[in-house]
Amino acid sequence: MALQFTEREFIPVLLGGDINAYSVARAFYEEYQVKSLVFGKYQTGPAYRSQIIDYTPNVDIDTMPVMLKTVNGIAQAHADKTIVLVGCGDNYVALVAQAKDAHELADNIVAPYAPYSMLEQCQKKEIFYELCEKHGVPYPHTFTFTKAMLNAQGEAPAEVLDQIDFPYPMILKPSDGIMWWQHEFEGQKKAYEIADRAELEQVIRDSYASGYTDDLIL
C-alpha cells in the first residue's frame, strides 16, 4: 500500500541520520502525514532511503556555516511555509540553539529550543543532577569520575573506585555527550551497563585515552 502524504503549512527539517531522526520523522508522518527533509552526515543509517524521508547526506552538516546555509536556503525556497527545525542529537540541538540565540535563522524557521546557556546546563549530567538537587527532583544515586582522578598510567586508582558504594551492574555515561562523540574509540557506546570492576576500569581507561576530557557519570 502506497504511503499518503498531505500538504501542510509547515515542513519538518531534521538534522541527523540515526534512529533519532527516523523516529522524529515517523512521528511527524503518523500525526500529520508529511514527509520530513532530513540532513545527516553519511549516506547510511535508518533515515537513509526511508519512504517518509527526503534524505540528503552532507559530511559537514554538523558545522555552523553549512547548517545555516542549508536550513536558511530551505526557508528561502519555501517562504510561504513554516520550517520546523529539529536537531536529532545533542550536537545538532546545541548548533540550532546557538544559531537561534544569535538570530541567524530565517524568520520563517521555528526552532523549539530554550536558550543555549540553559540547554548546556541540562546536557551536562553533573550540572543536571545539581539542578535536580536544588529543586527537589528525585534522581538516581550517582558517582562522578573526573579525568583528574586518573593515575600517572591513565588508569582509575583502586582507592577512587572503592568510594563507589552501589553494586554492579551499574550504568556509566559521559557527562558531555557532544564531546564524547568527537573522540571515537573501539567499543564506544552512548551508555554502558557495567557488569564488574574489570569492565569499569577498562571503559574509564579507553574513554580518556581517546581524548575525551570531561566527566563520566556512574
Model-flagged regions — what are they?
Residues 117-119:
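Short, acidic/glycine-rich phosphate-metal binding loop used to engage nucleotide
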Residues 55-56, 77-84, 99-100, 126-135, ...:
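Noncatalytic linker/hinge segments flanking ATPase motor cores
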Residues 121-216:
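Active-site nucleotide/adenylate-binding loops and adjacent lid/helix of ATP-dependent enzymes
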Residues 13-14, 84-86, 140-143, 217-218:
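Short catalytic-loop micro-motif centered on adjacent basic/acidic residues
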Residues 1-115, 148-159:
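ATP-binding N-terminal substructure of ATP-dependent carboxylate-amine bond-forming enzymes
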